[in-house]
Amino acid sequence: MIHRKASLKGLSRFFLLLACAALFTGCATQSPTASGGPGSSANPAATTDKKDLKDVRVQLSFLMQSLDAPLIVAINKGYFAEEGLNVSFERGFGNADTISKLGTGKFDMAFSDMYNALEFNEKNPNDKVIAVAVTQNKAPFAVLSLKERGISSPKDLNGKKLGAPAGDGPRKLFPLFAQEVGVDPKSIEWTTMEPKLRETFLLQGKVDAISGFSTSAIPSLLKAGKKPEDITTFYYTENGLDFYGNTILVKDSFAKANPEVVKAFVKAYFRGMQDVIKDPTAGLDAVIAADQSKLMDRQAEKVRLDIALKSMYVTPEVEKNGFGAADTARLQETIDQTVAGFGLKSKPQVADIFSDQFLPPKEQRQVPPAAERKPLS
């Protein structure tokens, strides 16, 4: 569903009414932004008049999810307002669509991946987009099956029927995955379906496995009654394709015209990320409370956030380099793999798609010490 935009003040009043009514119920997709909110600090910046702030329009990669907790926390606690920004957001309709709309100038910033952006840039050289920070150090690209199908290793996929939507990123990259794990891609029979039917096809036995994002597929399969031990997951990042996940993307022309705005956004976002790492339950609660549709499944969102916390947000690379950075050699290798997997004509270099000049100093984007991190509950 399409979600309405709201001012930072509007959501503050919304939360105040909830508190007065002793209600703090779960919601389901996404509401727009606000300064202040549950748990926000009593900071003058959090109540700065919106007319004094720079409006920044953001598009998510999909519906608002627990993976967006850093953004929601940064909004609620007034971190963007402290940097002079009034951030509003809308849901997305998939990574590729989000990038396309960013390129048209409908949004100032977006959350999506660099690899679809490479393809977009080749087709739209005059509307080039770039990544200014990595938000997910590991991509959730995966092939998933059920134990009952007898697929216990990637090689067991030979001759099987796989399912995914036509534009699915992991599906487009599957030939590279197959090459890494010893599967003949020509032996695979692909079935195409709508994204919302992907897990259903697997559950009904119409396909032997699916490609997609683990953060989407696993919560759906668990909600359908499967147990974690029933699900077999082959991550691309564990099989020779060490892709980064989502990033903060901006149009290149916007970044050049508004460098301080981009820097301010990135700085505030990673303050939110640090808070989520310290207290993921509070981050999850903030997302649930921010959604106005009241359809969000807290347990499914908890599973989604748990996956991100364990394998996407904090990795040895992030511990070493801080949030937002990218390893040049690793990124170039994945760019080269994308060129091959997507059949791109150009051969981009790291500087063509990623810039670290908008990141705050490393000391401001460090991973919180383990002793300061609460468990997700």
Task: Identify the function of each model-found stretch.
Residues T33-E194, E199-Q204, D208-T215, F234, ...:
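Short, glycine-/small- and polar/acidic-enriched structural segments
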Residues T328-S377:
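Conserved C-terminal helix/tail region of periplasmic/extracytoplasmic solute-binding proteins
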Residues S88, A96, T192, Y235-Y236, ...:
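Short linear loop/turn motifs
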Residues M1-L53, E363-S377:
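Short, low-complexity disordered leader/linker segments with a strong preference
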Residues N116, L197-T200, K206-M296:
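Pocket-lining segment of extracytoplasmic ligand-binding domains
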Residues A257-G343:
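Secondary-structure end/capping motifs
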